[in-house]
Amino acid sequence: MSQNAEKITDLKTALYDFHVSVGGKMVPFAGYQMPVQYPEGIMKEHLHVRANAGIFDVSHMGQFSIYGTEEEYLPLEKIVPIDLKSLNNNQSKYTVLMNKDGGIDDDLIVTKVEGGLNIVLNAACKHHDIKRIHEVIDPSKTKLHKDLSLIAIQGPKAVEILDNIIPGVSALTFMNGSKFKLNNEDIYVTRSGYT
């Protein structure tokens, strides 16, 4: 293995120490050390999420922003086939990133926010996707956020549980988000995602 490849698999999310402390079996994934399972096992985890809810650290995914006016981010429509003008603030769309031949390179979620767009990119492809986006968007108007965590909560009781911790979350409709405070920290919650 090359020295560069070893470095890439040494990346850790902010929750790495927590995962290890609760017995997470850590494996390399998309350049990060990520938990693949916990001591109770995959089946028990799966059944718990299906009946209740589960928390997933997906901080290895790309959290990418495009800053600027609508005029500055509209060129993204050349490679992402959605109508960005039709998005309301805090509304998300699941879409694809097209290659130069009009085929699909990847899928992603785009959210319109005040001052631009937030995009969640797949972990394994994020650097390729950013390079493609930079073909139509000025790189000085973009940022890959390496200092943010991304947590997914899934399951039939996810909204109920989260609303007890962050009142108001239950008012969000699918593919919409909002800013909230949690322990005096600014957070952004969307009711979106797919698996």
Regions found by a protein language model. Give the residues of each.
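Basic, glycine/lysine-rich polyanion-binding surfaces/domains
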Residues: 1-195
